[in-house]
């Protein structure tokens, strides 16, 4: 399967120059790109743009939000009409760092110690980005021209649902396969989906706190309600639906009950001198790959409207709903579509063979318990695999770390896959 002499030289180069790979991770981490607050990735993306231009890539860079640009670098294949193309995708933004967190070392000064590299974003996912870039540089160092197109995407906004990847798809970038180098501990993964939503209970009349007795006691004469208290019924209804889903729904690769409804944030009322005339609940729903977020939204709304009909006041003042969004920052909403993997596909079979050839171990296929931008690539019709270095429990954590051996092995596996995939003729 492999042109061993070429592959062996490439892999030896990675081993010989792993300090350069680690230095690249450190450079990327040194650009503080936490999201939120976001709007801080331009310098890091300019570095990546320059890096890719030196490799002979055609580079496209555009603002998704002010000071938050995407970068897409294309290595055009020598026979791109006949050979398979590949997208390497990753996000440059990282999880926020709170001042109260107790880091052993400064989070944006990545340090190497006892076989790990530590710093914000090393696992999620500047380690994966560095592996992609270093693999491309290794091909360039050996003057290897791939027959198929290689497209590298460094995108913004993943941490807050801003879907820089969706912007790439809308700009027309496509391929025969996409690999998202996000945190998967080098397992080949698909994922469930996530959608957030706002549920609002609103009274058309505002009551003084002094009239509460009239609202709740016999003979009070006022037909009104506290929006906060009515929201409590809806939360109870969500919990009942969540338990029902856990019993009645399942999906291969997921433990029972992964389809959750999280009442994540609530706000309501004006101040203590008023009966709360409005209450808003922000929820996060995880759903399975065989479901669509449109189906899930309909199911939740239908259930809560039935709950409301059982309440005399909410029967006349039903809750309203707002779903999804384009940004947790801009409009307080997000969608991450689900995607499944085809274990019999050429891509999965090739990646399995390469991993076994290089490590002597079978690579696992599974479903991620979190979400990535991979769903947007899949929704655009691109077969997609989540395959990247780092453990999920390290992502977003204080003292975030990545095992160096895993990063190096991932880089070698990815490099080999790039070479082999882009030398396969289109089906």
Curated annotation (Swiss-Prot):
EC number: 3.5.1.-
Residues noted as binding Zn(2+) 2 in the record, renumbered to the chain: 124, 159, 396
Positions that bind Zn(2+) 1: 91, 124, 182
Biological process, per Gene Ontology: thiamine biosynthetic process; thiamine diphosphate biosynthetic process
Catalysed reaction equations from the record: N-formyl-4-amino-5-aminomethyl-2-methylpyrimidine + H2O = 4-amino-5-aminomethyl-2-methylpyrimidine + formate
Free-text comment on the cofactor: Binds 2 Zn(2+) or Co(2+) ions per subunit.
Functional pathway: Cofactor biosynthesis; thiamine diphosphate biosynthesis
Keywords (A to Z) from UniProt: Cobalt, Hydrolase, Metal-binding, Thiamine biosynthesis, Zinc
Cofactor(s) in the UniProt record: Zn(2+); Co(2+)
Primary enzyme class: hydrolase
Gene Ontology molecular function terms on file: hydrolase activity; metal ion binding
Cysteine pairings via disulfide bonds: none
Active site residues according to the UniProt entry: 93, 158
Domain of life: Bacteria
PANTHER family per the UniProt record, alphabetical: ACETYLORNITHINE DEACETYLASE, N-FORMYL-4-AMINO-5-AMINOMETHYL-2-METHYLPYRIMIDINE DEFORMYLASE
Family designation: Belongs to the peptidase M20A family.
Task performed by this protein: Catalyzes the deformylation of the formylaminopyrimidine N-formyl-4-amino-5-aminomethyl-2-methylpyrimidine (FAMP) to give the corresponding aminopyrimidine.
Protein name (Swiss-Prot/TrEMBL): N-formyl-4-amino-5-aminomethyl-2-methylpyrimidine deformylase
